[in-house]
Amino acid sequence: MYLKLLQSCNRLHPRAWDFIQLMRLDKPIGTYLLLWPTLWALWIAAEGVPSAKNLFIFITGVILMRAAGCVVNDFADRNFDGHVQRTQARPMAAGRVSSREAWTLFAVLVGLSFGLVLLTNATTVYLSFGALALAACYPFMKRYTFYPQVVLGAAFSWGMPMAFTAETGSLPPEAWLLFIANLLWTVAYDTYYAMADRDDDLKIGIKSTAILFGEADRVIIVTLQGLALFCLLLAGVRFELGQWFHLGLVIAAGCFAWEFWKTQSRKPQVCFKAFLHNHWAGLAILAGIVLDYATKA
C-alpha cells in the first residue's frame, strides 16, 4: 500500500521516483531504526505521556533527517556505488540525479528539519547542530577510518538527548546510557549491513567494521548487542522501568540470537536480512517502554 502510494507519484512528475529512491522513502527500515530509539527517549523523558507537539516534531524530523542523510550519503558514494552490485542502480550512481539536484534537495530537507527544531527550545536547537554535523560527515568517514559505523551510531543516537531536552528542558546523566546503548546497537546492525558489501568494499578501498573485524565479526556483533542490552537494563533501573520493559529486552535478545544463528554462512543476502531484522528488536523495546508506563497509570 505504502509502496504503491509512492510509485503513484510518478504520475505527478516523471522523475519523482528517482528522488524518492534517493531519499530511500521506498525503503523505510532505516527510518524505523532511527525512529524507535528516538521514541524510547521521548517516552521515558515524558514518563509515558509525550506531548502531541513533540511527537509530531520528532517523528517528522526523523523522516526528514534520515532522507537528508541518504541524499548526502549517495552524493559521497556516487563514484563508488556503481562498482557495488547492491547499489549500482541508485539514482546518482546511474546518473539520473545530478550533484546540484542532490544538494538542493539536501538543503530543503535540512531546512524543514531545522524549522521543526525551532518549535522546541534553545538547548534542543543547539544540540541539532551536532545532529547535522554527524549526518553530513558520516558518509565520508568510510574513506578514512574502519569505524564509520561508530559515527553512524552517534548520528542515529543524537535524537535521544534532543528528545529529553525538548520534553523536559534538561538532560539527566541517565539519558546517556540510552545514547550509549543505541550507539552500540547501531554499530552491531550496521556491521551486518557492511558484511553484505564486504567483498565489493575490499575491491574499491572502502573501510568498515566488517572488514576490520574479519572472521570475528559475528562474535563482536553479538557482544555489542549484549552490551547494548546491558546499558538499557541499567537505564531501566535508573528510570524505574518494570516487567514490560524487561520483556521487551528479552524479545530483543531473542532477535539478536536469531540473527547470530542465521548469519553463520555470512552470505551477503543473509547478512542484509539480519540488518533489516534489527528493527523488530527496536520496536520490541519501544513496545515494552510504552506498555510499562501505560500499566503504571
Swiss-Prot record:
Any single Gene Ontology cellular-component annotation: plasma membrane
Primary localization: membrane
Role, per record: Catalyzes the prenylation of para-hydroxybenzoate (PHB) with an all-trans polyprenyl group. Mediates the second step in the final reaction sequence of ubiquinone-8 (UQ-8) biosynthesis, which is the condensation of the polyisoprenoid side chain with PHB, generating the first membrane-bound Q intermediate 3-octaprenyl-4-hydroxybenzoate.
Keywords annotated in UniProt: Cell inner membrane, Cell membrane, Magnesium, Membrane, Transferase, Transmembrane, Transmembrane helix, Ubiquinone biosynthesis
InterPro entries tied to this protein: HB_polyprenyltransferase-like, Prenyltransferase, UbiA_prenyltransferase, UbiA_prenylTrfase_CS, UbiA_sf
Secretion signal, residue range per the UniProt entry: none
Cysteine disulfide partners in this protein: none
Localization: Cell inner membrane
Pathway the protein contributes to: Cofactor biosynthesis; ubiquinone biosynthesis
Source organism (scientific name): Stutzerimonas stutzeri (strain A1501) (Pseudomonas stutzeri)
Any GO BP annotation: ubiquinone biosynthetic process
Record GO terms (molecular function): 4-hydroxybenzoate polyprenyltransferase activity
Designated name of the protein: 4-hydroxybenzoate octaprenyltransferase
Enzyme Commission number: 2.5.1.39
Keyword Transferase (UniProt): yes
Transmembrane segments: 29-49, 55-75, 102-122, 124-141, 146-166, 169-189, 219-239, 241-261, 270-290
Family: Belongs to the UbiA prenyltransferase family.
Bilayer topology term: Multi-pass membrane protein
Catalytic function, reaction form: all-trans-octaprenyl diphosphate + 4-hydroxybenzoate = 4-hydroxy-3-(all-trans-octaprenyl)benzoate + diphosphate
One Pfam family named in its UniProt record: UbiA
Cofactor annotation: Mg(2+)
